[in-house]
Amino acid sequence: MYFKDGFRDEVAIIGMGCSKFGERWDTGLEDLIIEAAFEAFADAGIGPKDVQVAYFANTAAPNNCSGTPVADALKMHGIPITRNENWCTAGHIALINAVLAVKSGMCIPAMAI
């Protein structure tokens, strides 16, 4: 999904986080999400309670993780968390949905996980 004029002057990425790379077979999916999310919160200077909507990218996780366990782990209750599953492009789809949510005026900020 591409837009002719883009959103350069209207939407910004204010924070970014990433879980540590490596063979971490003993680390669960939710722990990896928490690690990346709290790094992004610190980078943006916001907390979980500031997020108004979130889009969770899932790539065929064996436990079929929905947005609800993520909401519980991040203490992000009372907001919509939409799960996107689209194999290798799941993260891209989550980011596009977060951009569209902000662009539409639905919320500020949105989060792509």
Listing of model-derived features with the role each one plays in the protein:
Residues P80-I93:
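Cysteine-centered functional microenvironments
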Residues H92-L100:
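Conserved phosphate-binding catalytic cores of ATP/NTP-utilizing and phosphoryl-transfer enzymes
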